[in-house]
C-alpha cells in the first residue's frame, strides 16, 4: 500500500475540503481517466483495491497511472481511552480528493475495456466518479 517514505511532521490537522480541484484536473498521461465528482478522503487501501481491480481486468495490455497519493496521516486513539492526554498515533494514510481531481489514467487499451476497468475501480472507491476521455477532460 502507498504511504510516504518520510514526512516533516508525524501528525496533521484534519482541514477542510472546499471548492474544486485546482491542480490535477486534466489528463496528462493516458487516453482515459477516472475523475472524482465529490470531495472525500481516500485511504491507501481503497487506492490499492482500485488498482488491483483495474490491473486484473486489463491483464497484460495497457498502462495505468495512479495520480492520487495518500500523504495525509489520520490518527486514532486506542479503544476505551479517556479524553485528554494528547492526540492519538497515526493509524493510516489518506489522500484528500476534491471534485474534478483525476485519480487514475489508462492508455493502450480500447475505450470499452478502459470504461469497464474504470467502472470496476470506481466500485472500490467511496465517492461518485466520472469516466472521461482526453477530448472532454472537464468537470
UniProtKB/Swiss-Prot annotation:
The protein's assembly and partners: Part of the 50S ribosomal subunit.
Residue stretches spanning the membrane: none
Gene Ontology cellular-component terms listed: cytosolic large ribosomal subunit
InterPro entries: Ribosomal_uL16, Ribosomal_uL16_bact-type, Ribosomal_uL16_CS, Ribosomal_uL16_dom, Ribosomal_uL16_sf
One GO BP annotation of this record: translation
Protein name: Large ribosomal subunit protein uL16
Keyword Ribosomal protein on entry: yes
Gene (UniProt): rplP
This protein's UniProt keywords: Ribonucleoprotein, Ribosomal protein, RNA-binding, rRNA-binding, tRNA-binding
Molecular function in Gene Ontology: rRNA binding; structural constituent of ribosome; tRNA binding
Function: Binds 23S rRNA and is also seen to make contacts with the A and possibly P site tRNAs.
One Pfam short name: Ribosomal_L16
Family assignment from sequence similarity: Belongs to the universal ribosomal protein uL16 family.
Amino acid at each position: 500500500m502507498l504511504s510516504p517514505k518520510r514526512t516533516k511532521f508525524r501528525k496533521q490537522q484534519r482541514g477542510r475540503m472546499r471548492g474544486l480541484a485546482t491542480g490535477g484536473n486534466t489528463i496528462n498521461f493516458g487516453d482515459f481517466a477516472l475523475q472524482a465528482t465529490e470531495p472525500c478522503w481516500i485511504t491507501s487501501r481503497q487506492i490499492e483495491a482500485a488498482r488491483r481491480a483495474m490491473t486484473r481486468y486489463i491483464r497484460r495490455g495497457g498502462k495505468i497511472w495512479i495520480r492520487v497519493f495518500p500523504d495525509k496521516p489520520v490518527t486514532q486513539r486506542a479503544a476505551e481511552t479517556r479524553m485528554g492526554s494528547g492526540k492519538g498515533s497515526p493509524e493510516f494514510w489518506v489522500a484528500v480528493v476534491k471534485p474534478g481531481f483525476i485519480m487514475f489514467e489508462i492508455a493502450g487499451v480500447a475505450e470499452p475495456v478502459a470504461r469497464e476497468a474504470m467502472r470496476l475501480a470506481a466500485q472500490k472507491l467511496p465517492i461518485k466518479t466520472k469516466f472521461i476521455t482526453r477530448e472532454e477532460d472537464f468537470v
